[in-house]
Amino acid sequence: MPEPLLDVRALDAGYGDFQALFGVSMTVAPGEVVAVIGANGAGKSTLLNSIAGMIRSRRDAIRFEGVPIGDHPAHAVVARGIALVPEGRRLFASLTVEENLKIGGQLGRPGPWTLARIYELFPVLAERRTQPATSLSGGQQQMVAIGRALMSNPKLLLCDEISLGLAPIVVREIYARLPAIVAEGLSLVIVEQDIVQALAAASQVYCLQEGRVALQGAADSLTREAIAAAYFGV
């Protein structure tokens, strides 16, 4: 069996004295889309922040391409090829759309994602490239956040609640772009409360409940009843 791109093993994580994750394990294969679902406070964002190096953990709790990175700082994780699209987008208000995108490419990692390719993926950003990024609609700001992460030419893209606060039609538009991203050879981990979108986009699903994996399996094999039981802990 080929080695996974990402291998999370018995990960414990938290904030100070508060423990948010308890022995979480998951794998992501090259080119795979994995969804992590769960209610508010289930530990989904903590999992992504741990993988991204925003929260340091045990060295061998997270392996990327076979290399232990659990204790790596965020900048070292990005350099290895992992990029995070954070919850809330976190764009630089004083910078234009194009300036925000260019920040993602500062490491100079080689790959297919250039400004031209981002504008091809999200044409509306080309039209608004000289505007302040925070003057855009919420959906367009999310496109900037995704584009900025892609500009680092990652092998693994982590997306934290990309549908949060967006109209359903905008969410569908953004999710419709994900296959084009995967086609460039990326793997994706999507944290999502919208279960329908998560199941449609992913091949594997992990459901967290109070910091633990309550359910894991192929997206097309999980029943609504099983997901509801794991999601709500009933």
Language-model segment annotations:
Residues D60-P68, R80, W113-T114, E120, ...:
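Conserved ABC transporter NBD signature motif
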Residues I37-A39:
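The feature captures the beta-strand-to-loop junction immediately N-terminal to the Walker
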